[in-house]
From Swiss-Prot:
Protein name: tRNA-cytidine(32) 2-sulfurtransferase
Gene Ontology MF annotations: 4 iron, 4 sulfur cluster binding; ATP binding; magnesium ion binding; sulfurtransferase activity; tRNA binding
Function: Catalyzes the ATP-dependent 2-thiolation of cytidine in position 32 of tRNA, to form 2-thiocytidine (s(2)C32). The sulfur atoms are provided by the cysteine/cysteine desulfurase (IscS) system.
Alphabetical GO biological process terms: tRNA thio-modification
Upper classification of the organism: Bacteria, Pseudomonadati, Pseudomonadota, Gammaproteobacteria, Legionellales
Length: 256
């Protein structure tokens, strides 16, 4: 697939997500969380292209959190943002030391790291008056999270494309919800984004998400529709076919 075709495909699915879930309204100030990875770069690049087209009237701002991880170097990232003329701020907060101190060796850091990062993001968005917080999770993240929740937490849940935070002060959006990771990888390579690797997570083996990712990949080899069917299932729920007592009063369920 050519460079333009990949970009066109991704923009199509981002616009579909924006419209299906009314993610962005006229006049919104959208804070895009830029981690330095392929997904967040792709999200920011595509939203910027859509903004420049002019059909969607909104402003974007890139928020970068430097968590003081060893080897972090954002000089190329700064250059890329300056070149694109995208306003941004890089905030330094040492969550790395906290995670290393609290999590025993050999255990996964992702949960605590995410909680700390989320608190900082919410606080910054509120202080700066942003109406939307855009995250770079894509289709594969959503379906992997679904299986992870079932397998390891005993819950049927995932990542919604649009979410009101628990404190009801922030609206989170995931414009890449329909986009496949393989297309994002191609796009990121073509755009030559100056990626910043996450040394904290990348050094850990056998993460749950990687195992679930391999499982879905293996199933897709037998039936290519498996990933798309899983995504479709997230918006095609049949509550009467489940066994949640909060949805149905099973004890009183009888024929009239």
């Amino acid at each position: 697939m050519s460079e333009k075709r990949v970009e066109k495909k991704l923009i199509h699915y981002v616009k579909k997500a924006l419209n299906d879930y009314r993610m962005i309204n006229t006049g919104d100030r959208v804070m895009v969380c830029l981690s330095g990875g392929k997904d967040s770069y792709t999200l920011l690049s595509l939203l910027n292209s859509i903004r420049i087209e002019g059909n969607y009237k909104f402003d974007i701002f890139a928020f970068v959190l430097d968590q003081s991880q060893p080897g972090w170097d954002d000089s190329a990232l700064r250059g890329w943002l300056d070149d694109k003329k995208i306003p941004y701020e890089i905030l330094t907060r040492d969550t790395y030391s906290i995670v290393k101190e609290k999590i025993p060796a050999g255990k996964t850091y992702c949960s605590l790291c995410s909680r700390l990062r989320r608190g900082i993001i919410y606080r910054y968005a509120e202080e700066q008056g942003f109406s939307k917080i855009a995250l770079g999770h894509h289709r594969d993240d959503l379906i992997q999270t679904l299986l992870m929740s079932v397998f390891y937490n005993g819950q049927i849940r995932s990542m919604p494309p649009k979410l009101l935070s628990d404190n009801r002060r922030h609206v989170l959006i995931r414009p890449l919800a329909y986009c496949q990771e393989r297309d994002i990888i191609k796009y990121a390579m073509e755009q030559q984004f100056p990626l910043i690797p996450c040394n904290l997570c990348g050094s850990q083996k056998n993460l749950m998400r990687q195992r679930v990712k391999r499982l879905i990949s293996d199933l897709a080899k037998e039936n290519p529709k498996v990933p798309s069917n899983m995504l479709r299932a997230l918006s095609n729920i049949k509550p009467s076919q489940l066994m949640d007592h909060e949805l149905w009063n099973f004890r009183e369920l009888n024929v009239d």
